[in-house]
């Protein structure tokens, strides 16, 4: 089989997801214009428009809050946080609001937000942190997924789009 960059696998999978799910959208720092920092969304803003594939400011807590609001209203948002190191800025909102919505409302409300990020590069001093142990404890009520490769990541997105529960 031909070798393909991981970004191409993700881009093609997101393309199929946006085609299949009209309520799916993705937003975050650099998602739209450049197609995310690794070009995993390359060309999708042009194809699906600025509402479904959009850029945001550098405010992780706001990105998470926007995602919760969109999910509560029946959309299927994917909120991108550029690097796992930055997830800590949104942890309070994820822990108190997102992760507990189904439980607190006895299943009457759902916020199936997917929080997309990348990490575990384990090189250099920037973007290489791994708060995973803390996330597992702090985000009870959310799926926390760490794919081994981009094919598995694509499969996770496909499965999560059918779920009513939030995930990181």
Model-inferred region functions:
Residues 1-168:
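Thiamine diphosphate
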């Amino acid at each position: 089989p031909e070798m393909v960059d991981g970004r191409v696998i993700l881009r093609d999978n997101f393309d199929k997801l946006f085609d299949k799910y009209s309520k799916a959208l993705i937003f975050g720092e650099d998602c739209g214009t450049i197609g995310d920092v690794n070009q995993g969304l390359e060309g999708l803003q042009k194809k699906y428009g600025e509402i479904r594939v959009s850029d945001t400011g550098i405010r992780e807590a706001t990105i998470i809050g926007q995602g919760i609001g969109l999910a509560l209203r029946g959309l299927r948002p994917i909120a991108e946080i550029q690097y796992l190191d930055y997830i800590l800025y949104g942890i309070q909102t994820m822990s108190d609001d997102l992760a507990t919505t189904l439980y607190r409302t006895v299943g009457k409300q759902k916020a199936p937000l997917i929080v997309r990020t990348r990490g575990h590069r384990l090189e250099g001093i920037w973007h290489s942190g791994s708060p995973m142990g803390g996330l597992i404890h702090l985000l009870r009520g959310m799926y926390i997924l760490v794919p081994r490769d981009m094919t598995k990541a694509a499969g996770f997105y496909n499965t999560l789009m059918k779920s009513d529960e939030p995930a990181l």
